[in-house]
């Protein structure tokens, strides 16, 4: 069941739980047992299957809330395309304020994060960034110069070559190479089968009986149904969304009449939605208010506010305050029906985009916001079964996170790499639409056994109806296994 929850479902382009500031979820015993480097406590975090980078981003953006620590992230993903997206989202979050405004940056992030189709302006940005990433993965010295917070030294040469190919694919302007609207509809038809002709009812059922019942009531039917139909979740400005988002392309071995063939397509989620990651929780409780039992704000609006807040805090080190009505967040989401997705681009928008493109050419690139005391290490997928064999990681990780799609890889050997009193965070399947309630409930027992097998215990009761993560602590009686140096 743990494996079935996510094994080869395709890449987890967005997670099945809201973004976490991982320092919030570090148990007190973990914090008390941190070791220091250069006078700073060091928090070593292993992320296995984080997927969309939401936990990484939120933890980095909110680091100024905590006592000064050195944060070291070690990331293992199921697909190299996910590491490529990590690089994109990190570089976007760290764009210098003089290079890109807060509102524009936040809208661009959500568009690339959760949309199958993007604006031509956004596609141009992606192509430009792809050039940078190609240089980074092919020239380590250049990468350390422009993105010193990122460490790719553990990535194998073959994986570097594959990352280069991914970025080269992103760089190609031809939309015909990735007809995601066709892929999306095809996957929808296969998923729904005979229900396809009455799919609006299926969408409403999943939203009401799964997402709403499990606590994601802020997602409204209009935005959810539109995403289920088109794959477009965030449309924060008037614009034409007609360019395939190539960052959602990946390859999978698919059985065909001629045998198994490596095929590029869209292999990700079409039921849970990108809204869960950033759009169903917020510190600004006024955004969760209801009127006559209906949420006043949409998941899109909440997601935009949350991303603006995170990026503001990253740039300034200060918690974001909601501006007075009519100021900075005036350009929030309009009803989905007002959006244009093809063919009806206005002359005014064309003029605006040309002017913005010209401004971009004339502006001098300012580089990235400096990340102090943060290291991000990409690790090969094969290492998920080899970390305990590498002496450098013995008793090393203070916090370990496994997504629901990769928790089946949590083995007893992980007690070797967990530091004293380490925290283990496991994603649950509460918001996984494709699972019935009995499967969501039984999943808790399964992952608890996996955690216990790896030497972790918990005194916290886990309620499958309300919790979307489970926390465990490394037990004192954990037995060290023999490791190879």
From Swiss-Prot:
> Gene Ontology terms, cellular component aspect?
dynein axonemal particle
Subcellular location field: Cytoplasm; Dynein axonemal particle
- Chain segments annotated as coiled-coil in the UniProt record: none
- GO BP term (any one): axonemal dynein complex assembly
What are the protein's UniProt keywords?
Cilium biogenesis/degradation, Cytoplasm
Q: Which PANTHER family match?
A: DYNEIN ASSEMBLY FACTOR 3, AXONEMAL, DYNEIN AXONEMAL ASSEMBLY FACTOR 3
| Name of this protein | Dynein axonemal assembly factor 3
Q: From which lineage does this chain's organism come?
A: Eukaryota, Metazoa, Chordata, Craniata, Vertebrata
Query: Its gene?
Result: dnaaf3
